[in-house]
């Protein structure tokens, strides 16, 4: 909707909005007849139509007197209710003066304020809250005051609201209103009446509200939740302006933490944190938040509370460590996103004191996921495994209990869970030698249960790399041979492949099936692991006879795999084929140097990789800790050195923001000004500029219009048109401008998809006093206003996993490939630049983003407010001259978002 506001005036609030298809124009004579001679039902229907016409921009002022004469005297309650709506929506003034007819209306309202029916009284009092005409309100004040003593709470409640409205806008009509309401509050027993009265004092006479609160401070816990909520707000306001009063009210806030109302409990916790940073206060507030987290069913509430707990953890990590077991109770939520946030908090709160309890709790949760009736599914099991993985590596004393548990999930059909387990075992077996023997034995035992190629590859690599005795080595050889049994039978290779495929159709997923289906990378990994097992056996001083037998067995298996790859209908990877051939070659002709490469250098390389990850994690942590929250030249006003006149209510809050380092709003003014667009020139007779406000599904243009001439401009008409998926909801009505006057208008534009849009327009006007002709028509063509798609895109890296990214990458059909063209020379900096430009979140972990190798690949993801997903893959390398080259591929389910993001990157690629 659009509305017009002239300078110096206040836009009238719209309190009623009813959609109505006008159809035929109003029949004024017919309406008059119905009011004058119709039945009560006819009057009701006609009055409804008149109200609807008036609301929708077609007032019928000539019906005012007939309504006063023939409808207003009725005692029907429905008519009285409709009349209150009618008085509310009609124009009650003419040329700034109250219409004479409103005197008659005023008399009717006075009668209704003294009506014997409480509903009529209360409805009339409620209507007075919406009146802004002092001439109408003045004669009604005595009756409004008398209703404070009405026996019915409905009347008293609305009488308080009426006095609140009158005093707020015309305090001279009831100068003693604060004292009146204060005395009323002392005697009142009804909760809703007390709430309204307290709100009135809170906003109009804070000192009276504080006086009342001080007198009943011990009774606050027994108040209703409506009143308690306002009490909390008052305490926050009082303590902000008078810090010395904090100790007086903290006890009250502590008691309200146990309120039965979730809203009161939430506000009390927030207020307590703002009043005190003492451990007792922080612990009490955090406990209240945790109670809400565990007991509230609304997922939105849970997410908000989790954000609050994250904020507490940043400044009071020790306290959160004490409460971590209480937070874990929130894992009972069926929402997976909530569980992820809970586990993220837990990960940062693990200590030597609570690690055993946390691991025990998580083990119980993992066991629950094995039940068929469990709702959360495999993804929940994965994040539990991931949490155990990360937390147990921090405190290795629990690894002995964790490893056997996680081993059970090596054969998990859900890829992320199984991969996480085997990666965890690979890291543990290198970092903690004391656990190697246990892990190797368990790995060999569970080898045949593994169903995922990547997991099997890592598992056989770990076994070959870290096996420590001949017994385990022979056990591993037997296990691998059994897993390849069908492939090793002495038949023609084509028959082997066909029989294996036929057999696995009715069997579960197996390594044989994966190789038969063409996974030659897996075959090459098995070949290299078998080769390493042979070299490891020689290192363990195996007998010559057994050594020759083992070598023959290994070479036979590798030869079979090579022959299978040649006969397969699935094309063999060249690197995999060459890898298998090289294994045969080193087995035939090996020397000390080759054995050192296979047995020592490979392990050293992996150990260096783990050290590199630790260094990167440490560097990222230090960067976070060293982040400067407050610049040294920021000014903090000291209250004691300022005069009272110079001290404003916002100073305290602004100083507090600076003191705690919350500089997120530091550039707010700069961002606000950047959204102002100049639509016409300073030399034009009318200067126009627009401020763009972007909401979730629409855009509101705050348009400022300046008459730069000395003439009165009439029929000033602003016409807007759009390109793209934009739709103007309502036109701005024509208006008149005095010389040198400023006027503002609002236009609402609906956005239906994530696409770049353009708003264009003209502003036409007539000059007052001139003879109307085409030559007198003036028109200013406005500049184009471009709507940026980035305003509707949000990072989604917290919603995506690597597996989900890959699945969506395969599903999404629209792709936009953009060549990299930039003057940035740092690979990591370029990735962050693209993330900032497109508002996409970086899914690739920070530790994997590095300039060391000269090449970099990163995944990014985002989601629009319309639910559209967008994925991006950046593949770049640094050339010899220092420049970056490569491609950015964007994939999306809909074409528009892929195209617009590509255009954004293309336009911004050269900017650092």
UniProtKB/Swiss-Prot annotation:
It comes from the Eukaryota. It is found in: Cytoplasm; Golgi apparatus membrane; Cytoplasmic vesicle, COPI-coated vesicle membrane. Keywords: Cytoplasm, Cytoplasmic vesicle, ER-Golgi transport, Golgi apparatus, Membrane, Protein transport, Repeat, Transport. GO terms for cellular component: COPI vesicle coat; Golgi apparatus; Golgi membrane; perinuclear region of cytoplasm. Its main location: cytoplasm. InterPro entries: ARM-like (IPR011989), ARM-type_fold (IPR016024), Clathrin/coatomer_adapt-like_N (IPR002553), Coatomer_bsu_C (IPR011710), COPB1 (IPR016460), COPB1_appendage_platform_dom (IPR029446). It is a peripheral membrane protein. GO terms for molecular function: structural molecule activity. Pfam families: Adaptin_N, Coatamer_beta_C, Coatomer_b_Cpla. GO terms for biological process: endoplasmic reticulum to Golgi vesicle-mediated transport; intra-Golgi vesicle-mediated transport; intracellular protein transport. The keyword Protein transport applies. The coatomer is a cytosolic protein complex that binds to dilysine motifs and reversibly associates with Golgi non-clathrin-coated vesicles, which further mediate biosynthetic protein transport from the ER, via the Golgi up to the trans Golgi network. Coatomer complex is required for budding from Golgi membranes, and is essential for the retrograde Golgi-to-ER transport of dilysine-tagged proteins. This is Coatomer subunit beta. It comes from Dictyostelium discoideum (Social amoeba). The gene is copb.
């Amino acid at each position: 909707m659009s509305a017009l506001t002239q300078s110096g005036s206040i836009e009238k609030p719209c309190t009623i909005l009813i959609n109505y298809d006008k159809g035929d124009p109003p029949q004024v004579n017919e309406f008059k007849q119905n009011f004058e001679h119709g039945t009560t039902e006819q009057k009701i229907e006609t009055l409804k139509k008149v109200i609807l016409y008036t609301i929708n921009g077609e007032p019928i002022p000539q019906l005012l007197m007939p309504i006063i004469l023939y409808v207003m005297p009725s005692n029907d309650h429905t008519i009285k209710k409709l009349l209150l709506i009618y008085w509310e929506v009609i124009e009650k003034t003419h040329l700034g003066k109250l219409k004479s007819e409103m005197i008659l209306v005023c008399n009717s309202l006075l009668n209704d304020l003294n009506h014997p029916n409480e509903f009529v009284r209360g409805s009339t009092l409620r209507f007075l809250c919406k009146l802004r005409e002092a001439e109408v309100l003045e004669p009604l004040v005595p009756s409004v005051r008398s209703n404070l003593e009405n026996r019915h709470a409905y009347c008293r409640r609305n009488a308080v609201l009426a006095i609140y409205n009158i005093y707020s806008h015309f305090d001279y009509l009831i100068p003693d209103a604060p004292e009146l309401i204060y005395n009323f509050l002392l005697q009142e027993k009804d909760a809703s009446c007390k709430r309204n009265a307290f709100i009135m004092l809170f906003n109009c006479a804070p000192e009276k509200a504080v006086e009342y609160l001080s007198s009943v401070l011990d009774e606050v816990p027994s108040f209703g939740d409506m009143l308690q909520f306002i009490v909390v707000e008052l305490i926050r306001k009082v303590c902000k302006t008078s810090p010395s009063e904090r100790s007086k009210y903290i006890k009250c806030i502590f008691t309200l933490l146990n309120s039965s109302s979730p809203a009161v409990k939430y506000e009390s916790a927030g207020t307590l944190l703002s009043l005190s940073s003492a451990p007792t206060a922080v612990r009490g507030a955090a406990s209240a938040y945790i109670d809400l987290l565990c007991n509230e069913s609304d997922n939105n509430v849970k997410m908000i509370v989790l954000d609050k707990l994250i904020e507490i953890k940043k400044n009071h990590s020790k306290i959160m460590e004490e409460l971590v077991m209480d937070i874990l109770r929130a894992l009972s939520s069926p929402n997976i996103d909530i569980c992820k946030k809970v586990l993220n908090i837990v990960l940062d709160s693990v200590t030597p004191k609570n690690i055993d309890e946390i691991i025990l709790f998580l083990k119980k949760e993992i066991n629950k996921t094995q039940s068929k009736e469990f709702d959360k599914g495999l993804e929940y099991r994965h994040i539990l495994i991931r949490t155990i993985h990360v937390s147990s590596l921090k405190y290795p004393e629990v690894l002995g209990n964790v490893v056997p548990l996680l081993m059970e999930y090596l054969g998990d059909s859900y890829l992320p869970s199984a991969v996480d387990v085997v990666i965890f075992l690979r890291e543990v077996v290198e970092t903690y030698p004391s656990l190697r023997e246990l892990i190797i034995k368990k790995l060999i035992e569970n080898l045949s249960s593994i169903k995922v190629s990547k997991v099997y590859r890592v598992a056989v690599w770990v076994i070959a790399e870290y096996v420590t005795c001949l017994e385990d080595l022979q056990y591993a050889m037997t296990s691998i041979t059994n897993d390849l049994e069908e492939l090793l039978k002495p038949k023609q290779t084509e028959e082997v492949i066909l029989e294996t495929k036929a057999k696995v159709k009715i069997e579960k997923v197996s390594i044989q099936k994966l190789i038969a289906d063409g996974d030659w990378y897996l075959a090459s990994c098995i070949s290299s692991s078998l080769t390493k097992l042979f070299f490891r056996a020689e290192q363990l001083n195996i007998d010559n006879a057994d050594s020759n037998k083992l070598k023959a067995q290994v070479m036979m298996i590798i030869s079979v795999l090579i022959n299978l790859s040649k006969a397969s209908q699935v094309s063999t990877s060249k690197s995999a084929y060459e890898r298998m051939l090289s294994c045969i070659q080193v087995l035939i002709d090996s020397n000390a140097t080759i054995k050192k490469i296979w047995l020592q250098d490979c392990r050293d390389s992996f150990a260096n990789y783990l050290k590199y990850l630790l260094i990167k994690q440490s560097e990222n942590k230090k960067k976070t800790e060293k982040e400067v929250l407050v610049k040294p030249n920021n000014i903090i006003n000291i209250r004691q050195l300022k005069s009272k006149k110079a001290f404003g209510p916002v100073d305290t809050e602004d100083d507090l923001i600076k003191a705690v380092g919350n500089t997120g709003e530091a550039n707010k003014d700069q961002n606000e000004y950047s959204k102002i667009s100049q639509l016409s020139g300073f030399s034009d007779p009318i200067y126009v500029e627009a401020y763009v406000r972007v909401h979730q599904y629409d855009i509101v243009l705050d348009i400022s219009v300046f008459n730069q001439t000395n003439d009165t401009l009439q029929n000033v008409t602003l016409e807007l048109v759009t390109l793209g998926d934009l739709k103007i909801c309502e036109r701005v009505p024509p208006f008149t401008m005095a010389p040198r006057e400023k006027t503002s208008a609002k236009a609402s534009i609906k956005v239906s998809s994530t696409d770049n849009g353009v708003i264009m327009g003209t502003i036409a006007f007539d000059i007052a006093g001139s003879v109307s002709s085409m030559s007198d028509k003036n028109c200013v063509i406005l500049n184009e206003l471009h709507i940026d798609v980035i305003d509707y895109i949000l990072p989604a890296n917290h919603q995506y996993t690597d597996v989900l990214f890959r699945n969506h990458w395969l599903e999404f059909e629209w792709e936009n490939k953009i060549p990299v063209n930039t003057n940035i020379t740092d690979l990591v900096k370029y990735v962050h630049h693209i993330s900032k430009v497109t508002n996409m979140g970086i899914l690739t972990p920070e530790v994997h983003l590095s300039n060391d190798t000269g090449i970099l690949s990163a995944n990014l993801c985002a989601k629009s407010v319309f639910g559209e997903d967008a994925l991006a893959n950046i593949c770049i390398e640094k050339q010899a001259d220092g420049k970056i080259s490569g491609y950015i591929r964007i994939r999306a389910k809909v074409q528009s978002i892929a195209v617009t993001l590509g255009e954004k990157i293309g336009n911004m690629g050269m900017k650092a």
